[in-house]
Amino acid sequence: VPDAWKRPTRARVLRIRDRLREVYGIPRMAPHGRPLDELILTVLSQSTNDRNRDVAFLRLRERFATPGEPIDYAAMLAAPVSEVEVAIRPGGISKVKSARIQAILAAIAGTEPPGAASTPGAAAGSPPTGDALSLEWMRDAPVEKSRTYLCALPGVGRKTAACVLLFSFGLPDIPVDTHVSRVGTRLGLFRPGAPFEELHDQMLAITPPGEELEFHVNLLRHGRRTCHSRTPACAECALARMCPSRGAFASRP
């Protein structure tokens, strides 16, 4: 990417979006409305692949949910951390993730959503209830307020918060993972050297309103299928003609 970086124009962003749309289509994914599930899924996804993440989440369901019912997060919080650790072992670094999951649940149970009325489970000495362990209030709350709340939870950053808001409720936020970051940087969408957390603000600023899901999913797909980390397939890239980084990897073995 050239040193003299300039914020991409709307026309350039739309050309990239349209070309990605030609290759990958428009993803269809209705918001699932389960923000706490999404939050825990994102924790489980850290340092592993989608398959291992999904197996770990399924194991959590088997341990802490009655068939056909949602996960009992109050029971998960009350359980010994070793039970959570055993359940999520297929997802890797289970000791770290199990402690983080319980810390997040404890924080939700013990803190109030911004502007919310008193929550029974948050009272001193009162065990958390299903209602206390809920993020449903975010459905109608200002996005910035919900994002700030999520990012204050233990181990939760902008990407995790964006996953919860976008995938659970379809709210205007956009996760920037390693694939989106890599593709966006090579295309010149991001300021070179920008801190990872800052990329979310840059991504939101350039994404056409209402197209957050499409842009995230298609950039991610392109990163996985073509714009690989070490050996991107530039010769086969649908975006090659509009990529300032094309040819930069030709000399690599």
Q: What is the predicted role of each segment?
A:
Residues 2-252:
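Catalytic cores of DNA base-excision repair glycosylases
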